[in-house]
Amino acid sequence: MSIDLDHKLSVLAAAEEAPDAVAVRSNGDCLTYGVLAEKVRDILPQLGDARPYPLIARPDLDTLIKVFALLERKQPILLLHPGLTEHERNTLLASIEGLDHHFPGNTAVILFTSGTTGLPKPAILTREALAASAEASRDNIPLSPGDVWLLSISPARIGGFSILTRSLIARSAIALGPKFSPKEYLRRLEVDRVTYSSIVPTMLRMIFDEAPEWRPSKNLKALLVGGAPTSEKLKAEAEDKGIPVILTYGMTETASNVVTTPFAERYRRTCGSGKINKGVQIKSEDGHLFIKGPMLMHGYWGRKPLVPGAWFDSGDIGEVDSDGSVCVPP
């Protein structure tokens, strides 16, 4: 484990660098990195030694503090979605009961996949994978101190959790959002001076339906839309409204997106799902997408780890053009 990587994923180090920089925004209120670091220090002795540490991950300050504290301790986190019923949560926990708890020493987090087919699988993501994903994202999407990323989706999903790690590494701010509703979401964009936000296509559809006159402020640099394919109709509406949309494609197993719309093209409607991120390799064989790169998971908990440097079968149908554009059909 490199000292540089530990430094990047340390909120205490961030506080030493810029104690007065804004780390968290919430409905107009601000929390600096210095204050956030103190809250993390206060909670460190209370965490216990569970490996992994089970955490119901909500888009709130308590979750944020615990995640950063666990990253500070290099203690693996097991994220559970707050929307699960008690029965669903117990079913997931039962599926991992009895599994070997000897994780790789660099394990950062275990996230359950979306479970579109069968029981969700626990994917092990290392600190290196999270950092590689953040760096690949930042190569296309400029994120720096002063930026604010709205956490409008649960950090129990990789799309939400990656906002925490990207922002920490960039020393930028996270805006904590309430339960999604178009009206409140748009209000928070303004009140918290949001520069980036990540949503799914259904959320964008709801915004257009309930607030057809909405146009983005100059603060908003990009709206990342992913988690599912975006229809051509939705792309066209976004372009007509002058909304800077970055389409994304990725999954839990790749520590977030591996394909994105080029930042310079965010105001234009583009074909497909975007272009391959720097440091990622994607190929299509018989119409199926295979992925290779340092942001890949270690493997699924309880199964053999992935072979380093090998191609990962995404399970998705798609095509890759010669210019690096990827198309994943609806």
Give the location of each predicted region:
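Active-site loops of AMP-binding adenylate-forming
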Residues: 127, 251-271, 295-296, 303-306
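Conserved AMP-binding/adenylation subdomain of ANL enzymes
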Residues: 132-148, 156-196, 210
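Conserved ATP-binding/catalytic segment of the ANL
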Residues: 288-330
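Gly/Ser/Thr-rich phosphate-binding loop
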Residues: 195-199, 208-267, 281
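Conserved AMP-binding/adenylate-forming
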Residues: 29, 44-83
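Conserved AMP-binding/adenylate-forming core of the ANL superfamily
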Residues: 2-3, 7, 20-48, 86-93, ...
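Conserved AMP-binding A3 loop
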Residues: 32-33, 108-135
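Conserved pre-ATP/AMP-binding loop-to-beta segment of ANL
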Residues: 2-8, 19-20, 98-112, 119, ...
